Amino acid sequence: VPMKNDIRAVTVPGAVDGWLTLHERHGRLDLDTVFASAIHSAEDGFPVHPTLSATLHLIAAVEHADLPAAAPAGAVVTRPGSARALRAIARDGRAGFYEGEFGEGLLAAGPDEFVPADLATVQARWVEPIKVDAFGHQIWSVPPTSQGYLTLLSAAIADGIEFDDDGLGAHVLVEAAIQAGHDRPTELFDGADPVRLLDAERIADR
Protein backbone atom coordinates (compact mmCIF):
# COMPACT_ATOMS: atom_id res chain seq x y z
CA VAL A 1 0.00 0.00 0.00
CA PRO A 2 1.48 3.40 -0.93
CA MET A 3 2.31 5.53 2.12
CA LYS A 4 0.95 8.83 0.77
CA ASN A 5 -0.13 10.80 -2.30
CA ASP A 6 -2.02 7.82 -3.68
CA ILE A 7 -5.76 7.15 -3.41
CA ARG A 8 -4.98 3.46 -2.82
CA ALA A 9 -3.69 4.42 0.63
CA VAL A 10 -7.14 5.74 1.58
CA THR A 11 -9.74 3.55 3.27
CA VAL A 12 -13.44 4.22 3.71
CA PRO A 13 -13.44 6.28 6.92
CA GLY A 14 -15.22 4.45 9.72
CA ALA A 15 -14.95 7.11 12.43
CA VAL A 16 -18.13 8.96 11.46
CA ASP A 17 -20.06 5.70 11.39
CA GLY A 18 -18.63 4.95 14.83
CA TRP A 19 -19.66 8.35 16.22
CA LEU A 20 -23.22 7.92 15.02
CA THR A 21 -23.45 4.33 16.23
CA LEU A 22 -22.34 5.45 19.70
CA HIS A 23 -24.76 8.37 19.59
CA GLU A 24 -27.68 6.15 18.66
CA ARG A 25 -27.09 3.94 21.67
CA HIS A 26 -25.78 6.34 24.28
CA GLY A 27 -26.33 9.91 23.05
CA ARG A 28 -28.58 12.31 24.94
CA LEU A 29 -28.00 15.53 22.98
CA ASP A 30 -29.12 16.12 19.41
CA LEU A 31 -26.43 16.10 16.74
CA ASP A 32 -26.70 19.86 16.17
CA THR A 33 -25.65 20.38 19.78
CA VAL A 34 -22.97 17.69 19.67
CA PHE A 35 -21.23 19.24 16.66
CA ALA A 36 -21.91 22.92 17.41
CA SER A 37 -18.53 23.70 18.98
CA ALA A 38 -16.55 21.90 16.27
CA ILE A 39 -18.55 23.61 13.52
CA HIS A 40 -17.96 26.99 15.17
CA SER A 41 -14.19 26.39 15.28
CA ALA A 42 -14.09 25.20 11.67
CA GLU A 43 -16.18 28.08 10.33
CA ASP A 44 -15.02 30.99 12.49
CA GLY A 45 -11.45 29.85 12.95
CA PHE A 46 -9.05 28.70 15.62
CA PRO A 47 -5.48 29.73 16.53
CA VAL A 48 -2.69 27.74 14.95
CA HIS A 49 -0.69 25.74 17.50
CA PRO A 50 3.12 25.90 17.11
CA THR A 51 3.20 22.19 16.23
CA LEU A 52 0.65 22.72 13.45
CA SER A 53 2.53 25.76 12.18
CA ALA A 54 5.73 23.73 11.89
CA THR A 55 4.06 20.99 9.85
CA LEU A 56 1.70 22.89 7.56
CA HIS A 57 4.28 22.83 4.76
CA LEU A 58 3.64 19.10 4.44
CA ILE A 59 0.25 19.77 2.85
CA ALA A 60 1.55 22.31 0.33
CA ALA A 61 1.24 19.77 -2.48
CA VAL A 62 -2.13 18.38 -1.36
CA GLU A 63 -4.94 19.32 -3.71
CA HIS A 64 -8.10 20.84 -2.21
CA ALA A 65 -6.63 21.00 1.31
CA ASP A 66 -8.76 23.21 3.56
CA LEU A 67 -5.75 24.42 5.54
CA PRO A 68 -3.14 26.94 4.32
CA ALA A 69 0.30 25.70 3.35
CA ALA A 70 1.85 28.13 5.84
CA ALA A 71 0.64 30.06 8.88
CA PRO A 72 2.49 31.40 11.94
CA ALA A 73 1.64 30.16 15.41
CA GLY A 74 -1.30 32.10 16.76
CA ALA A 75 -2.76 32.95 13.36
CA VAL A 76 -6.44 32.15 12.99
CA VAL A 77 -7.34 29.61 10.31
CA THR A 78 -10.62 28.11 9.21
CA ARG A 79 -11.53 24.70 7.79
CA PRO A 80 -14.57 25.29 5.59
CA GLY A 81 -14.61 21.78 4.16
CA SER A 82 -14.65 20.24 7.61
CA ALA A 83 -17.42 22.63 8.63
CA ARG A 84 -19.56 21.56 5.67
CA ALA A 85 -18.99 17.89 6.45
CA LEU A 86 -19.92 18.34 10.12
CA ARG A 87 -23.05 20.32 9.22
CA ALA A 88 -24.08 17.57 6.81
CA ILE A 89 -23.64 14.93 9.53
CA ALA A 90 -25.60 17.01 12.05
CA ARG A 91 -28.40 17.52 9.53
CA ASP A 92 -28.61 14.18 7.73
CA GLY A 93 -26.65 11.72 9.86
CA ARG A 94 -24.74 8.98 8.12
CA ALA A 95 -26.13 9.75 4.68
CA GLY A 96 -25.01 13.36 4.99
CA PHE A 97 -21.40 12.22 5.11
CA TYR A 98 -21.11 9.00 3.12
CA GLU A 99 -23.64 9.95 0.44
CA GLY A 100 -23.05 13.70 0.53
CA GLU A 101 -20.26 16.01 -0.60
CA PHE A 102 -17.53 13.97 1.10
CA GLY A 103 -18.68 10.64 -0.31
CA GLU A 104 -19.06 12.10 -3.78
CA GLY A 105 -15.55 13.53 -3.53
CA LEU A 106 -14.09 10.19 -2.46
CA LEU A 107 -15.76 8.41 -5.37
CA ALA A 108 -14.50 11.07 -7.78
CA ALA A 109 -10.94 10.87 -6.40
CA GLY A 110 -10.81 7.10 -6.64
CA PRO A 111 -13.17 5.90 -9.37
CA ASP A 112 -11.18 2.69 -9.75
CA GLU A 113 -10.86 2.09 -5.99
CA PHE A 114 -14.31 2.88 -4.58
CA VAL A 115 -17.89 2.22 -5.61
CA PRO A 116 -21.08 3.56 -3.98
CA ALA A 117 -21.65 0.22 -2.25
CA ASP A 118 -18.38 0.71 -0.33
CA LEU A 119 -19.77 3.87 1.23
CA ALA A 120 -23.21 2.36 1.82
CA THR A 121 -21.74 -0.47 3.91
CA VAL A 122 -21.91 0.15 7.65
CA GLN A 123 -18.37 0.45 8.98
CA ALA A 124 -18.90 0.35 12.76
CA ARG A 125 -19.65 -2.74 14.80
CA TRP A 126 -19.91 -3.53 18.49
CA VAL A 127 -17.04 -5.70 19.73
CA GLU A 128 -15.78 -7.09 23.03
CA PRO A 129 -13.09 -4.79 24.47
CA ILE A 130 -9.67 -6.02 25.52
CA LYS A 131 -7.68 -5.02 28.60
CA VAL A 132 -4.48 -5.38 30.58
CA ASP A 133 -3.72 -4.70 34.23
CA ALA A 134 -0.83 -2.24 34.50
CA PHE A 135 0.33 0.42 36.94
CA GLY A 136 -2.49 -0.48 39.31
CA HIS A 137 -5.21 0.14 36.74
CA GLN A 138 -7.25 -1.76 34.21
CA ILE A 139 -6.50 -0.30 30.78
CA TRP A 140 -9.07 -0.99 28.06
CA SER A 141 -9.05 -0.73 24.29
CA VAL A 142 -10.68 -2.25 21.24
CA PRO A 143 -9.38 -5.43 19.56
CA PRO A 144 -7.74 -5.76 16.14
CA THR A 145 -7.95 -4.52 13.50
CA SER A 146 -7.62 -1.47 15.73
CA GLN A 147 -4.08 -0.63 16.82
CA GLY A 148 -5.37 -0.27 20.39
CA TYR A 149 -3.61 -3.46 21.48
CA LEU A 150 -0.29 -1.62 21.00
CA THR A 151 -1.19 0.81 23.79
CA LEU A 152 -2.10 -2.06 26.09
CA LEU A 153 1.01 -4.04 25.22
CA SER A 154 3.23 -0.98 25.72
CA ALA A 155 1.73 -0.36 29.16
CA ALA A 156 2.11 -4.00 30.18
CA ILE A 157 5.75 -4.11 29.07
CA ALA A 158 6.58 -0.86 30.87
CA ASP A 159 4.80 -2.07 33.99
CA GLY A 160 7.27 -4.95 34.20
CA ILE A 161 10.24 -2.59 34.42
CA GLU A 162 11.25 -0.76 37.57
CA PHE A 163 12.03 2.88 36.91
CA ASP A 164 11.94 6.11 38.87
CA ASP A 165 9.71 9.03 38.03
CA ASP A 166 12.72 11.26 37.45
CA GLY A 167 12.03 12.36 33.91
CA LEU A 168 13.91 9.43 32.42
CA GLY A 169 10.82 7.26 32.60
CA ALA A 170 9.73 8.67 29.25
CA HIS A 171 12.59 6.74 27.65
CA VAL A 172 11.29 3.50 29.18
CA LEU A 173 7.83 4.20 27.77
CA VAL A 174 9.26 4.91 24.32
CA GLU A 175 11.26 1.68 24.35
CA ALA A 176 8.20 -0.24 25.56
CA ALA A 177 6.20 1.15 22.64
CA ILE A 178 8.96 0.12 20.22
CA GLN A 179 8.95 -3.41 21.60
CA ALA A 180 5.16 -3.55 21.42
CA GLY A 181 5.04 -2.50 17.80
CA HIS A 182 8.11 -4.12 16.26
CA ASP A 183 6.08 -6.99 14.76
CA ARG A 184 2.92 -5.01 14.04
CA PRO A 185 3.14 -5.49 10.23
CA THR A 186 2.85 -9.27 10.64
CA GLU A 187 0.62 -9.44 13.72
CA LEU A 188 -2.11 -6.86 13.03
CA PHE A 189 -4.71 -8.12 10.58
CA ASP A 190 -8.39 -8.98 10.32
CA GLY A 191 -9.08 -11.81 12.72
CA ALA A 192 -5.89 -11.41 14.78
CA ASP A 193 -6.27 -13.02 18.21
CA PRO A 194 -6.08 -10.32 20.91
CA VAL A 195 -5.68 -12.91 23.67
CA ARG A 196 -2.49 -14.17 22.05
CA LEU A 197 -1.24 -10.65 21.36
CA LEU A 198 -1.56 -9.80 25.06
CA ASP A 199 -0.42 -13.16 26.43
CA ALA A 200 1.67 -12.83 29.61
CA GLU A 201 4.53 -14.92 28.20
CA ARG A 202 4.62 -12.80 25.06
CA ILE A 203 4.77 -9.66 27.21
CA ALA A 204 7.56 -11.12 29.36
CA ASP A 205 9.61 -11.96 26.26
CA ARG A 206 9.73 -8.29 25.33
How does the language model describe each region?
Residues 163-206:
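Internal maturation/activation junctions in enzymes
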Residues 148-162:
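Short linear sequence signals and composition-biased patches located at protein termini or domain-edge surfaces
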Residues 38, 86, 154, 173-180:
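Short alpha-helical scaffolding segments that buttress acidic/His motifs in well-ordered protein cores
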Residues 29, 77, 114, 161, ...:
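Short coil/turn linker and secondary-structure boundary residues
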Residues 1-99, 103-137, 143-146:
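Noncatalytic scaffold domains of N-terminal-nucleophile
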Residues 24-29, 93-94, 158-165, 184-188:
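Short helix-capping/linker segments at secondary-structure and domain boundaries
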